[in-house]
């Protein structure tokens, strides 16, 4: 997994509405944002608490390196010294950094995150058929079944020039899909999607899935010089029952192969499902920095008593 061009990354980060500026990690600048959390259902976390966190963040109390709306595109480099020098012009209360691996630093609390699932594209895969042919019969049958089951869904590229027409519906489907899965939902999903379209232009790909002339799902991806990153996915409940999720993932893999990408990052969540497609987990974690003793105690308490790492079993769909 290789990061996208830093200048392009910074341009995207600075275009988000919650962009804050730059923090310095061991003297190197890295963009940060004011953390935005949302939980429309209120199923797991009291929305009042989330509003309080968001208020603290907008007041400059919590700084998040990068943006939770664009995970996995860049990771700050962490030295092996066991300590990182972090400078923040506003000297906020808490800084949160998503990094590869699980480094132990003397001035940070490390909390594990769900792995990013990354598929390395083999040189022998000149087409999507080559990719399927590399699978063992068991997984080849599963893949073909997922593709056959969704044959009644047609797919077409959504034009960025006509983004105003499809973004509202896609934003609604994305919010519906994520509402029980993550806290990191932008309060304004439409504006977030517009930011990707406006900033990345032709490097931002969006495909819509239609059944009976109705848009039932979409998936987006970012093309970089080295690879493809699956980004946003939204679909209706019926489309989910029809295994359209798997079809979308396979279509992004198809795009990556045809685009001669070195890898396709399928993002977080659904770890076992993505492993059946050949993706491998990429360990990453969050580093929490704070100078406040009470805040340090709270973060360590959360890690010890509340944080749970999901268990999963990695599958190998390939013959070799």
Language-model regions, residue ranges each:
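Generic hydrophobic, helix-prone segments enriched in Leu/Val/Ile
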Residues: 9-13, 89, 150, 245, ...
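Feature targets compositionally biased, intrinsically disordered low-complexity regions
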Residues: 16-20, 26, 65, 81, ...
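Active-site/acyl-donor-binding loops of N-acyltransferases
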Residues: 30-40, 103-130, 134, 195, ...
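Acyl-donor binding region in acyl/amide transferases
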Residues: 38-111, 227-286
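Glycine-rich loops and low-complexity Gly/Arg-rich segments
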Residues: 55-56, 120-122, 142-145, 179-183, ...
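Short C-terminal domain-edge/linker segments immediately following a structured domain
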Residues: 59-64, 148-151, 186-189, 237-238, ...
């Amino acid at each position: 997994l290789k990061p996208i061009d830093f200048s392009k990354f910074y341009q995207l980060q600075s275009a988000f509405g919650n962009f804050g500026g730059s923090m310095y990690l061991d003297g190197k600048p890295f963009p940060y944002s004011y953390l935005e959390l949302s939980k429309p259902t209120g199923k797991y976390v009291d929305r009042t608490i989330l509003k309080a966190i968001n208020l603290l963040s907008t007041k400059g109390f919590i700084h998040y390196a990068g943006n939770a709306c664009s995970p996995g595109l860049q990771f700050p480099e962490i030295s092996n010294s066991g300590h990182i020098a972090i400078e923040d012009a506003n000297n906020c209360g808490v800084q949160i950094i998503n990094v590869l691996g699980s480094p132990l630093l003397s001035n940070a609390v490390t909390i594990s995150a769900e792995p990013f699932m990354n598929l390395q594209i083999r040189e022998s895969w000149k087409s999507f058929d080559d990719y399927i042919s590399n699978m063992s019969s068991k997984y080849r049958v599963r893949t073909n079944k997922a593709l056959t089951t969704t044959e009644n869904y047609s797919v077409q590229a959504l034009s960025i020039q006509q983004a105003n027409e499809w973004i509202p519906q896609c934003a609604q489907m994305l919010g519906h899909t994520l509402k029980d899965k993550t806290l990191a939902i932008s309060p304004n999903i439409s504006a977030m999607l517009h930011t990707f379209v406006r900033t990345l232009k032709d490097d931002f790909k969006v495909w819509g899935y239609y059944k009976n002339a109705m848009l039932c799902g979409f998936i987006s991806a970012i093309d970089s010089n080295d690879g493809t990153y699956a980004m946003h996915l939204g679909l209706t409940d019926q489309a989910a029952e029809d295994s359209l999720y798997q079809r979308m993932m396979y279509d992004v893999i198809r795009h990556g192969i045809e685009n001669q990408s070195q890898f396709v990052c399928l993002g977080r969540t659904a770890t076992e499902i993505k492993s059946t497609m050949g993706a491998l987990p990429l360990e990453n974690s969050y580093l929490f920095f704070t100078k406040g003793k009470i805040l340090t105690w709270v973060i360590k308490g959360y890690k010890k008593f509340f944080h749970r790492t999901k268990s999963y079993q990695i599958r190998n769909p390939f013959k070799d």
